Amino acid sequence: MLKVAVVGIGVMGYNHARIYNELQKDGNVELVGLSDMNKDRLNEVSEEFGVKAFSNYMDLLEEDLDAVSIVVPTFLHKEVALPFIKKGISVLIEKPIADTIENANEIIAEAEKNNVILSVGHVERFNPAVLKLKEHVEKGNLGDIVTMTAKRVGPMTTRIADAGVILDLAVHDIDVMAFLANSKVKHVHALAKNVKHPNNNAEDYALIISSFENSIDGIIEVNRLTPHKTRTLNIVGTKGIAYLDYMNQDLTLYDEEWVKTAKINKEEPLKKEIAHFVDCVQNNKQPLVTGLDGLNALETAIYALKSSNGN
């Protein structure tokens, strides 16, 4: 039985704990403990799931753990992840993998050195609509991809305290586009600004234009300005086009003669992601989202930020 823990139980960390708790019913996973600096929150959630509470995450290292989810603010990812990795414990780190390229490289190097599974929580790769679109792309149903256009907009949230819209929102679509293009970004240009939230140092609007090594172009619009939340991706190919709605998990494909709504078995992407991580640790498989994938997405996001600042 795989013994797991979660460090950081804010909104996203709570969902990691909830899903591990659900997976316990299959008998393959045991949620050993939770850790958070907020003791009231920690005690509340630990009591809900009937597991040990650790106010200091380092105390979890004394437990017989196989894997851990790291769901803390991005600037703490390296600090929290490395002690677990060095002890041979596999790690699922929420996106982005780290706050800097240097820290991401250090996490990846330690994971390789200690032969542990490292996966990054780019959860949209596990969205059933994205996986179905990937099938159509690989079968050539859209022909050669020419452009991909994503929109990820919505109101301001208090959930994210340490990142603007590029590192928090756009990084999702940066990764999905790389996944669908099966290529790395070659050039990136971005415009970004803070429109409505002057007390926040991070950008609340960004427009990113990228070119991949295989000549596919990508356009991403993200903001925390729009009252209505939208999460969409459109693809133009030489044989057809595709419209994807991330939230509704809908996918529609068109060519000159037909319109097709893809049949999709709708599932919670995060549950698919965590179940996949568990399977990779149990069976020593390479995860769908590797540390290198996380690094590539982070690099593109950071270069977009630099571009938006005129660098």
From Swiss-Prot:
InterPro entries: Gfo/Idh/MocA-like_OxRdtase_N, Gfo/Idh/MocA_Oxidoreductases, GFO_IDH_MocA-like_dom, NAD(P)-bd_dom_sf, UDP-GlcNAc_3-dehydrogenase. Oxidoreductase activity is reduced by 50% in the presence of 2 mM UDP, 2 mM UDP-Glc or 3 mM UDP-GalNAc. Activity is unaffected by metal ions. Homooctamer. This is UDP-N-acetylglucosamine 3-dehydrogenase. Its EC number is 1.1.1.374. It comes from the Archaea. It is an enzyme of class 1 (oxidoreductase). One of its GO terms (molecular function) is oxidoreductase activity. Signal peptide: none annotated. It catalyses: UDP-N-acetyl-alpha-D-glucosamine + NAD(+) = UDP-2-acetamido-3-dehydro-2-deoxy-alpha-D-glucopyranose + NADH + H(+).
